[in-house]
Amino acid sequence: VQWNNTLAVMAGDLIFSRASAIMAELGSSYVSYHARTFERLCLGQMDDIFGAPQDGSVSPIDFYLHVLREKTGSLIGAAAYYGASLAHCSPELVTALTNFGEDLGVAFQIADDVLDLRSTTAKSGKTPGADLRDGTKTLPVLLLADLVASPYATPHDRDLYREITDLDALQDDAVLALATQKLGAHPVTEQTRELAVAWVERALEHLDAMEENPVKAALRDFAHLQVNRLN
């Protein structure tokens, strides 16, 4: 089977439908939570498509983080919620673990933005610079745009921003490879990596509500994995 983005989306939809069948066996409260999660996921995808409000009420970076929480954080948070709830954890611990999952989902997506620029196809399974070529405004791109709009931008910053937003030129493999290498080496990508680490640390704080046990250790390892893959 030749996998591509369309097949991956369809596979995800199939898994989600089968999860819905499982939720139906658990009771109405779980079905309701599952439906709300799916709603958040879809609305997050719509927000991603339409983009940040043009009235300046929300900064593009804050809006992007909101999209990550709705698209990915909601899904990982739901997985944590189901596990904690079905294990009959206290309401406080259920909330803490749900927040752990949501924050970790944001960290996962931010780390993916770094991998798109600094990894290889063999390691990540993605073509480096694929997001640039598609015109996807990832966090490094948004941070560079923010820098270019400030008085602190250098001519190099402005030139690079023009390069990575010239979608016609980026269809050329050589141009894309060079633009990807330049943006990957720019400080905004290191800033993005640091933000991924910060979101992992934020997620780990929620585990303070748990006593030390093998489950907590496994969750901690899972959280660290999100940034360890950047090394």
What annotation goes with each model-predicted range?
Residues 199, 204-206, 210-231:
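Short, amphipathic C-terminal "tail helix"
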Residues 24, 146, 169, 208-209, ...:
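Alpha-solenoid HEAT/Armadillo repeat architecture
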Residues 155-207:
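Mobile late-domain/C-terminal helix-loop "cap" segments
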Residues 98, 177, 194, 217-221:
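Short, charged, amphipathic alpha-helical segments
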